[in-house]
Amino acid sequence: MERGEVYDARLSPTEGSEQQGTCPVVIVSRNAINDNSPVDVIVPLTDAANVKRPYPNNVLIPAAEGGLSMDSMALAGQVRAIAVSRLLRRRGVLSADTMRAIDRALRITLDL
């Protein structure tokens, strides 16, 4: 598993407003960590049509990029670590431009 790859992941159980169920996620942790850790840091994705208020830490990803079937929104405000065993099917890889946008969104979220 590598940074920028999109996977379907089992995110439940969750609480409150956390992204839940099986949904696409993008791996954002560095490859050196991904190669040696039982967990990956991910940003969940959701159907862009479901996002009522886009925040500056959300990133629009057009359909077909990364193997996505619809326009999606990366929710950098919900960045989290998950066990590799939660990752199911690999969908594809996001472009370098999209990953730079996600990096900017993560800097906003984490005040880096």
PLM feature spans:
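Conserved functional hotspots at enzyme active or ligand-binding sites that engage polyanionic ligands
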Residues: 1-112
